[in-house]
Amino acid sequence: MAPSFDTLSEQDLHEEEEEEIDFSDLKAQYEVKLEEGLDTFVVIDGLPVVPEESRQKLIKFLLRKLNTVGHTSEDAVFMPLNDKNMSEGYAFVEFETPEQAVAAVKQLHGTPLDKKHTLLVNKLMDIERYGREGRIDEEYKPPAIEPFKEKEHLRSWLADPNARDQFALYRGDKVGVFWNNKNHPPENVVDRAHWTQLFVQWSPKGTYLASVHPQGVQLWGGPAFSKQKQFPHPFVQLIEFSPGESYLTTWSARPIQVEEGQSILTYEEEGKNIIVWDIATGKPLRSFVSHDLTAGPAGDAEPKKKVQWPAFKWSADEKYVARMLQHQSISIYELPRMNLLGKTSVKIDGVMDFEWSPATVTREGVKQYEQLLCFWTPEIGSSPARVAMMSVPSKEIVRTRNLFNVSDVKLHWQSQGLYVCVKVDRHSKSKKSMATNLEIFRVREKGVPVEVVDSLKDTVINFAWEPNGNRFVLITTGEAVAGAAVAPKTAVSFFAPEKKGGAIGNFKLIRTIEKKNSNAIYWSPKGRFVVVATVHSQTSFDMDFWDMDFEGEKPEAEKDFAANLQLMKTTEHYGVTDIDWDPTGRYVVSSASVWTHQLENGWNLHTFAGQTLSENPTDKFKQFLWRPRPPTLLSKEEQKQVRKNLREYSKEFDEEDRYAVDIANTAVVEKRKRVLNEWIAWIRREKELLAEEKDAYGLPEEADDPKLAKDAAATTQEQGETVVEEIVEEIIEESEEVIG
């Protein structure tokens, strides 16, 4: 029978001490976790010490602060008293949700309550977790300072002496980064298996390569493409960089479930789909629930939903980011705090889409800083459809345009923000036919005048501005005939402004190419050259390479236009799905991805003029991505000087190209010469040895007679030397006989 406390002897006590067992590992393993309900509690320290009769007054005063970050009440604030009926200087507060408790810690910790008291706010669970005995060392131990390690140069590829460009290639389960070597095979930089699970994506300036995994996103960079940052977003599916690479947006269809012990994600991210990250710190700025878009106008049937992506759109200078709640509002947030501009969203009834200007524009007569945002709303009741331009941060509408009989609208900004083209698809009054007209806003001109291009008779299916230019290309198509097996033909139209002294004239049609199958437009990033192609087609795969500033003779009918159009070459790439220009505008890659079809996957390299340099069939080819370059550091004057001396530079480049070819040819010739010289030297050496042997045996120089050789062999045997005979067997004829 086990002894009771009353009957416990001294011997029993000593035995207990001797047999004491260390249960620390089991305690750690089976430690009872705190109730989930405690994650709504916070502890507020730094409060004034007041008597019991003043406690309620202090609680009411404290609630003014607390209700700015969440919802709580007097009953949810517990302020304990000591034996002298005085408060202890702290209080326990319960919020409605864990997110509100987290917000209280983030926003109220360290803020002043009055001139003499500063609030110290902590989660109750954190105090319980870190305040237990043994969790924190009593003695201060200085942190170990790791030795300095020089970081890799994240833009080292720009220092390539031959000014080559890099590209990423995703095929099978391998991702590689290569140098482009023109006519020669690409030079491998790095090639890794299972580098990504979904896809890879370059950041806008080429600093980082992003890989996407079920655990989140990782950024790679430097000469060896080492890991730079990671962003834990479980089951992430889509990512988007800000224009200056300062921020990253990630999205997953699955709401986030924060696991206990997760170091970066907090309860504030619980249940959200979108996270906006700060790339420099690797920490989330804010998280959101995603909004779906309706796939079409609401009718009797429930409209289909589609993912709104990009969910957030960035201003050119990254000072603002905005998202749209379709049909209701646009919310504009200020960076880096991610607080709502003016603390309210911009209410816009029926809003369908919006786009920021891709560059900071200075309008005539406007001196203050602004970013421009363009949006459109459909016809609602008797109200017409509307396109409007808003100035941020003032939220002032600076230009509006009413539209009628509108089916759809697309907004196309020119890369410098000089124009925004509003592509308006209109239906006839009977709603049986469709046509498109263009409303072009001239942003920098006084009052933002609008030019209308209404000469188009068909529906525009694609539109693209020339980068850093004022010309555009569009593709139109007629209405599909019901039951027809073949899609209607398309027409490609080229537009340019009229010459008007120093000003930019009205936009006019240069030329229309009829009876095409083209459906895609790809401008060179430097302008001037454009590829008009047919992609994602099962029957047509043509690519037309056009020059908008051809240096040859200009047709008489086009002399008033700021362009000289010339088709340089037409080529085909079977099954082509994607076309990508390199960032310098020198090369074009056409590719056929296994993500679209599994027929003759691979990629082809072309010059800007359409000459095919190489064809690269690649099994299980998925992605080809040129590495972007950051904007040039040269001033406009320096760039102008470079263009002025381009012919002189071209001579140097041509000489370098010839030298490189000569070096390659010289290397081949030198190798052949070396092998020939080695052979000649060997022959000379063998002849010298043979002459010495003949001299030793007393044979004449021309003694090659077999009889003399036989006598020489006998002589060598007499002299006691060893003779090695080599027997060579040769099969003259071989037959097989079967004996029955």
Swiss-Prot record:
One GO BP annotation is: translational initiation
Instruction: Domain (RRM): give its ranges.
Output: 40-126
Any Pfam family from its record, for instance, is RRM_1
Disordered: region residues: 1-20, 696-721
Q: Could you list this entry's UniProt keywords, alphabetically sorted.
A: Cytoplasm, Initiation factor, Protein biosynthesis, Repeat, RNA-binding, WD repeat
**Primary place of residence?**
cytoplasm
Give the family, as the similarity comment puts it.
Belongs to the eIF-3 subunit B family.
Could you describe the subunit structure of this protein? Component of the eukaryotic translation initiation factor 3 (eIF-3) complex.
Protein name (Swiss-Prot/TrEMBL):
Eukaryotic translation initiation factor 3 subunit B
- Organism of derivation: Aspergillus fumigatus (strain ATCC MYA-4609 / CBS 101355 / FGSC A1100 / Af293) (Neosartorya fumigata)
Gene assigned in the entry? prt1
